[in-house]
Structure formats: structure tokens, C-alpha cells
Amino acid sequence: MFARQSLRFAQPLKQGFRKYSTEAPSKGKSSLAPIYVAVGLTGLGVGLYRYNSASAEAPPAERPKVFTGGDQGWVDLKLAQIENLSPNTKRLRFEFPDKEAVSGLHVASALLTKFKPHGAEKPVIRPYTPVSDEEQPGYLDLVVKVYPNGPMSEHLHSMNVDQRLEFKGPIPKYPWEANKHKHICLIAGGTGITPMYQLARKIFKDPEDQTKVTLVFGNVREEDILLKKELQELENTYPRRFRAFYVLDHPPKEWTGGKGYITKELLKTVLPEPKEENIKIFVCGPPGMYKSISGPKVSPKDQGELTGILAELGYSKDQVFKF
């Protein structure tokens, strides 16, 4: 059984135990360390879920791709739109030179961004994960949260429309195929929601993919919850297959969700048991969260040993992927 914590925060976590409910009609086939959200994730951004179907002129597979990887080099894109989402978060839309082109990204993958500060000897390079649809022609969206002393996030927040930024990619993370796993669990902290949402959106867009998804999302404050509207839409549309649980370090008085940290007790309650077949747990967040939940990665190509809460609960290294 899986606990349900309402995205509308109307139901306390302790009262929320039940099985997946009947799914609503689809709208289209289309330890215990605190989660220090402000630390360590200066290189991540998140794109808004604003899928627009590709026009009839050419299917996505036949459209030109902006990012082709390999020895392509850096691609210069113009900032076309800025939307203030909160005092510390902006949505930035970067246009492609060819309005019919798609990004060329796949799930799950990211892009590198680069700029050179005035007077600096070396450029600043950071990875960002767009979550705008991979088949969206003409542009990509990032949602960027600014962090103190985070040179790339500070630069992006200082940009004006018509200024340009260099991108390179795609950088592969975890290749996804429909029904690759029966049930996946996404444990995210702060802007670590980025690749998680990219993956969830891909799953629920594909009518052939019947994967179940459980999200555990930790933040400092309620206003820090990125993509809350988009996550709520997924849960309302696919209640049999998508569940989201929220935990806040500093919740408001009226908060009815999880409080404090992502704990062993919470994960034991909401995650499938380690003995279940074909499950996968994904982790993405700041260093304190990795240390508590799964242990850190050694490098982009070395997942490192599985430690922390997930190891204590009996999950194996093969059942966990660290973004």
C-alpha cells in the first residue's frame, strides 16, 4: 500500500494510507539529515511542463536537432522570454535558430551551459536539465533558482532578453524505455526535481508505458516546491500510477504534509519493498541528502557504493540510480 499526501495539502500524511485509486480519464495520450536545498545544486535548472504538440509538417523524429553531441561543440542560443516565478526563481526560454528544430535531448539527459565572467581566466560550466518536452520545436525552457555564490545561477538571473548563452549536449544520464521498470521511485531535494520530472513526464506522455511512479520531494519551504502545478496535474490525471509526498524543513502552520527531513520511516512506508520485482529508485538532491539517503556518487560514471537509509532498508546497489 502507498500513502497518499494530497498535493492540495488537505490531508495529513498519517491519515493518507490507501491503495492507488481508480484512474481518471486521461486528458490525452500524449540519518535523517536535513535537505539543504541551497547547497550544492547551483548547476541544475528545471524547465516548465508546457508541452505543445509538434506541427503536422514533420514528426519529431524527422525534425532537425539542435544538439547532436559528439564533437558538435557549443551552441549559442538567445534568451527570448523571462518569467518571474518567485523571488528566487525564474523561467527562462531560449530560442532555437531554426523554429522547426527540436532540442535533440532524450530521457534522461542534460545540457552543459557556459559563460565567462568578466576578468576571469576560465569559463563557468554547469549542467542543466531542461524539462520542456523533448519534441517541442523552436525553444527550450529552464526554471532556474538562484543560489548565493552560485556563479551560473546568478548569471542566468542577471540576463536580459536577447542576450545569449552557450549550450552543449546532450549529456546522457539514464536511458529510458517504456515499461523498463514496473515501479520507479523518485527521491528529490530542491532543484533535484529536474531529472525526476523529465522522467515522469516522459512516462505519462507515452500511452504504452504503464510504469507506476512514487515521488518523495523535500524542500526547505512551501514556496520552494518547483513544478507543483505540473505535479498536481499528473497526480489528478493518473491517480492509479502517480503519487507525490512532500516534506518541508520549515513548514507553515497550516501545512499538513511531512515535516522535517526525509526519514527512514517515511521511505519504508511509501516505497515498494526491496523484494518486489523490477523496481528502481532514483535519487537527486544536495550533498546532505545523498549522504543520508543513498551515499554520494564517486564521479559521473561511478555510482559509488549504496549506503544510508536505502541500504538500511535492504535495497541493493542495482536497484538505485543517483543522478
UniProtKB/Swiss-Prot annotation:
A Pfam family it matches: NAD_binding_1
GO BP, sorted A to Z: ergosterol biosynthetic process
TM region positions: 32-48
Binding residues for FAD: 180-215
EC number(s) on file: 1.6.2.2
Keywords assigned: FAD, Flavoprotein, Membrane, Mitochondrion, Mitochondrion outer membrane, NAD, Oxidoreductase, Transmembrane, Transmembrane helix
InterPro entries per record: CBR-like, Cbr1-like_FAD-bd_dom, FAD-bd_FR_type, Flavoprot_Pyr_Nucl_cyt_Rdtase, FNR_nucleotide-bd, OxRdtase_FAD/NAD-bd, Riboflavin_synthase-like_b-brl
Similarity section: Belongs to the flavoprotein pyridine nucleotide cytochrome reductase family.
Listed name of the protein: NADH-cytochrome b5 reductase 2
Species in which this protein is naturally found: Neosartorya fischeri (strain ATCC 1020 / DSM 3700 / CBS 544.65 / FGSC A1164 / JCM 1740 / NRRL 181 / WB 181)
